[in-house]
């Protein structure tokens, strides 16, 4: 009998595996398939044909666009080996050969180009079929544009010898500080010839030593001058006023990963002096080092050892020509700790540059924003640095490097890369604005490796940086209105950065400035209790009510990157993309079934999103949004992951649970399984965890008012086993909904 039971069970297991494998295959999109589907929806027709035409000396390629043809008269016969020419809507375009960038600089070549637009492939590859349409459209619609760049991927053979697209490099919008740090434009740029030749003439007058550099570096230099001459390093980033445009589409297919070919490309050392031109609008008082005073503002309470360790690391390791002061803002340490702090601060050694340390004691409930605002009000500096008391300085030039950026007239907030103590594990490398909320980028990843085309190297423009280490000019802080005091704990730094961006400034994260962050020593982690989770949700509501235009958007994070889950890496969206057109989930009371299940922590319940469906789409509640919907369209959106440790997850059917905390009534919500490559990669020792993700859309009218706790019911389809476990996440259903 036992053998028969085992045989029947194996038949059931095999059946589950077949169904599971089919679903995995259907949900596991490849980048190649996903991007082609995206581009097909753009409706861009491939209407370009190429023809050969004979010049005076040899054959070269002329491209005909939409039936237009420009006869070659041999005017360019001395350099036509390196050119392709075509016309689009009465504009002449010339594509130069990437071979040019491996040869010595030839200024005469660039000066003699007679064309409206130059397309420069910086390495070998192919211009995409949609590129010319987008480039032409942008130049036509914006007369102020002088340069266009786009995204790129790699075309290569897969294991079946088919040519497929892979390795997408999805770039940010115009990022002036990243451009000064590295040539992130990549494989293809398009420039207006007139602007390029104007910058070329400027460099000629400056007697650039063309023989001392390669053509790529030389063009990098010309592009810098071109962008500078057209105010690309200025406050303000309205699309019609910025001379550089990022087309958020794949415009180039490289033969190998492009980043590896230009990652070491830098502006010439001789150009450091030229970069100083960007500072020309800084007030004279700030041009001299002695005119700068940095106020380091440190909020702290009842952490004398941690606080003093932070301050000692500043004094012992900082080497700077700038003057600075330290202000400690204490919101109510005990008398014993207060005395200890005052004694230690009064005994601090004098160091070069440090102009004193003040202790501001004002008992009040914890409010990070209010404490920082108090410190800023009392500070004497024209630059402000907000620093957590659990930070540790580890490099001498950290302050000077941050000040270098913070003093630029177009720069807003300046942050640093933070690591967990005594490790190379990243805690923070900027903040991106995902649909599920702001996220620390690259958190928990190894800083010893290069991540997503250098995102943990060099200098980057980001929408936000953590307030744990955030520097800015006083005028920037005051223009933004300081920290919002209704955001007492969370999102106050994000809100400030978003406001600074909306005011026209560029926020910066310097990955070449590294500090250790002994995170959350003072108040614990957000979301670890029901009270903290609900407070976090309320503060997130305030954030997006204030910044509705930014909800679900980030100019420095490509929309083809993952936006729909809490993502610290830079993963293309084909790995996880939410479609709200999913059917409404079936829901039923299942209190008895849940009570009969075994509660077991081996059933992992991960919640990532539980929110009003309208908020998911628009960032605010229906009464505060501009889009109006009917009551039938109102509901909730749930998303997360779940798996059973040490079991065959292909055999389990899972049901999301919502338990009314007052009456104990339990609702079961049918789920859609989602492919989660990130979970799979982190659970290499677990079986069949490809479809650990889940999502559901629930009509609002099903739930009565109250607070509901989330859980999961997992039923083994090949045995009688039922498991249940509960999350600490809750959903608050208001009485007025």
List where the protein language model places each region.
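Acidic donor-binding segment of Leloir-type glycosyltransferases
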Residues: 76-111, 315-364
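C-terminal, non-catalytic tails of nucleotide-sugar-dependent glycosyltransferases
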Residues: 2-58, 259-294, 422, 436-461, ...
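Conserved donor NDP-sugar-binding/catalytic core segment of glycosyltransferases
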Residues: 130-164, 241-242, 391-436
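A recurrent flexible, glycine/aromatic-enriched loop bordering the glycosyltransferase active site
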Residues: 167-193, 369-370, 434-475
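Basic, ligand-binding patches in group-transfer machinery
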Residues: 51-54, 85, 89, 125, ...
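Short aromatic/hydrophobic "clamp" motif used to bind/position activated sugar donors
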Residues: 117-118, 384
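A short, conserved alpha-helix in the catalytic core of glycosyltransferases
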Residues: 195, 209-242, 247-248, 399-402, ...
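Cell-envelope/extracellular polymer assembly enzymes that use nucleotide-activated donors
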Residues: 58-63, 293-297, 325, 495
């Amino acid at each position: 009998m036992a053998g028969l039971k085992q045989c029947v069970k194996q038949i059931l297991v095999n059946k589950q595996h077949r169904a599971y494998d089919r679903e995995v295959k259907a949900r596991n999109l490849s980048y190649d398939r996903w991007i082609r589907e995206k581009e097909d929806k753009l409706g861009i027709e491939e209407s370009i044909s190429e023809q050969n035409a004979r010049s005076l000396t040899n054959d070269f390629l002329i491209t005909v666009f939409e039936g237009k043809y420009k006869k070659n008269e041999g005017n360019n016969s001395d350099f036509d080996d390196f050119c392709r020419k075509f016309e689009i809507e009465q504009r002449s375009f010339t594509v130069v050969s990437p071979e040019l960038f491996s040869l010595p600089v030839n200024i005469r070549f660039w000066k003699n180009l007679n064309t409206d637009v130059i397309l420069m492939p910086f390495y070998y590859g192919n211009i995409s079929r949609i590129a010319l349409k987008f480039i032409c459209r942008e130049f036509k619609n914006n007369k102020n544009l002088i340069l266009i760049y786009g995204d790129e991927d790699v075309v290569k053979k897969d294991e079946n010898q088919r040519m497929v697209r892979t390795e997408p490099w999805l770039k940010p919008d115009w990022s002036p500080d990243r451009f000064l740090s590295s040539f992130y434009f990549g494989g293809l740029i398009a420039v207006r010839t007139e602007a390029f030749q104007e910058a070329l003439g400027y460099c000629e007058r400056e007697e650039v030593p063309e023989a001392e550099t390669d053509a790529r570096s030389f063009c990098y230099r010309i592009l810098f001058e071109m962008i500078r001459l057209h105010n690309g390093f200025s406050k303000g980033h309205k699309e019609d006023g910025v001379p550089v445009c990022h087309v958020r589409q794949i415009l180039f297919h490289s033969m190998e990963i492009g980043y590896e070919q230009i990652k070491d490309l830098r502006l010439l050392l001789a150009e450091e002096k030229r970069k100083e031109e960007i500072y020309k609008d800084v007030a004279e008082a700030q041009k001299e080092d002695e005119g700068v005073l940095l106020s380091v503002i440190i909020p702290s309470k009842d952490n004398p050892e941690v606080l003093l360790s932070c301050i000692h690391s500043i004094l012992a390791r900082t080497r700077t020509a700038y003057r600075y002061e330290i202000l400690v803002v204490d919101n109510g340490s005990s008398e014993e700790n207060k005395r200890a702090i005052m004694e230690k601060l009064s005994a601090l050694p004098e160091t070069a540059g440090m102009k004193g340390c003040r202790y501001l004691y004002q008992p009040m409930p914890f409010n990070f924003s209010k404490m920082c605002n108090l410190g800023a009000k009392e500070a004497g500096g024209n630059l402000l640095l907000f620093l957590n008391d659990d930070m540790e300085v580890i490099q001498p030039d950290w302050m000077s490097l941050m000040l270098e950026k913070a003093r630029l007239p177009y720069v807003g907030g300046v942050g640093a890369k933070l690591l967990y103590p005594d490790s190379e594990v990243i805690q923070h490398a900027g903040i991106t604005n995902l649909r599920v909320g702001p996220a620390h980028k690259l958190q928990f990843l190894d800083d010893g490796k290069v991540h997503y085309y250098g995102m943990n190297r060099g200098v980057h423009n980001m929408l936000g940086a953590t307030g744990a280490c955030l520097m800015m000019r006083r005028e920037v802080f005051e223009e933004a209105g300081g920290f919002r005091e209704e955001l007492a704990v969370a999102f106050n730094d994000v809100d400030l950065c978003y406001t600074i961006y909306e005011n026209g400034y560029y926020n910066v994260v310097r990955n070449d400035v590294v500090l250790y962050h002994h995170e959350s020593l003072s108040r614990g982690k957000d979301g670890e209790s029901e009270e903290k989770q609900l407070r976090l949700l309320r503060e997130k509501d305030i954030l997006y009510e204030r910044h509705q235009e930014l909800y679900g958007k980030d100019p420095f994070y490509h929309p083809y990157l993952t936006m729909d889950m809490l993502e610290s890496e830079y993963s293309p969206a084909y790995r996880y993309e939410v479609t709200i057109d999913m059917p409404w989930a079936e829901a039923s009371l299942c209190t008895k079934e849940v009570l009969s299940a075994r509660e077991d922590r081996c059933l992992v319940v991960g919640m990532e999103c539980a929110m009003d469906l309208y908020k998911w789409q628009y960032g605010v509640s229906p009464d505060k949004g501009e889009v109006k919907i009917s009551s039938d369209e109102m509901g909730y959106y749930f998303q997360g992951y779940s798996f059973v440790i040490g079991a065959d997850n292909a055999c389990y059917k899972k049901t999301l649970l919502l338990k009314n905390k007052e009456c104990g009534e339990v609702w079961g919500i049918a789920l859609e399984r989602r492919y989660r490559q990130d979970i799979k990669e982190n659970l290499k020792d677990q079986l069949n965890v490809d479809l650990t993700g889940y999502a559901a859309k629930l009509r609002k009218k099903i739930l009565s008012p109250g607070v509901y706790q989330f859980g999961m019911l997992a039923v083994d389809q090949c045995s009688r086993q039922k498991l249940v476990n509960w999350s600490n996440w809750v959903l608050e259903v208001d009485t007025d909904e």
